[in-house]
Amino acid sequence: MKSGGIRNYFLQYFIFIISAAASITMVAEDNVEYFKYGDFNSWITRQIPESRILGGKIKTLYEVGPTQTIEGAKAYKNLDGSPWATSNVYAKVVGISKGSCAVVPDTRSAGNKCAKLTTIMERCKAIGIINVDVVVAGSMFLGEMIEPVSSTDNPYSKMDMGIPFTKRPKALCFDYKLEIPVDGKHIYSSGFGKKKILPGQESAEVMVFLQRRWEDSSGRLYAKRVGTGRIRFDKSTKGWVNKYQLPIMYGDITKKTEYKPYMGLIPSERSYHARNSKGKIVPVEEVGWDNETATPTHIIVMVSAASGDAYTGTLGLTLRIDNVGTVY
């Protein structure tokens, strides 16, 4: 090969290497916008005195927000613009105060925390008055929990699900670590009636829905689904999975190969709830799929140590989550 040919060959090779490196850099430099407090390094500690009839102990609950301690049986409202709510609740039923905690901060490394979500059996016992066991799956979502909770009826009616959001991300990103107990049973226990062993294996779940919502003159809320991402994890991980991306598909996704039945529209009988313009918590009825170019008004993100109906789960199933954001 002549010297000129050699130079051209190496020049082309050099350009190829630079181009490949540039393409790799572009992938690595996805624009990620993290939700406020989405690194889970800052937590609020709540000290709830439970009723004497239940033993009168102090129950510790945690919320995601500015570091501080709140003492007393007080209804919690999100602080400092934190968009995060959890399944941790202060309940007051027929005058009896009780706390439940299935989401806690956990140390991931020195100076670095994450959220730890576990499915637990919450027991409430007062001799001669009450004796109930309730399966509680540790869950987190964008929105607000309405406290104090006064019953186990329709748990979604106690949750203001979703926050205003008008962007169109291509994915939800997060770090996660999952531990599923070997031979763990899938249990239903609502506190009423007998416990049941359900068929199948439980899994953890992460979902992101983009909705375009509107309100009618009577205060009813409706929505069309703009974007969908939903996944169920049914295998324990070998340590942390970092920078996982859950793709968001736009428009009607029912004909896509990636579609699974659990990604469908929310049935009206299981509608999530939100606060309308009158300040009332009402169902948000999903009435159809929106145009794939539509602009959303709200985003729903939920992370859970279970994927089934309320009051079901596998005790001990533990999902750790960290660094939650949207990818563009």
Which residues make up each language-model segment?
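A contiguous catalytic/ligand-binding core that recognizes phosphate-bearing ligands
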Residues: 161-166, 188-194
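Bacterial Sec-dependent N-terminal signal peptides
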Residues: 1-34
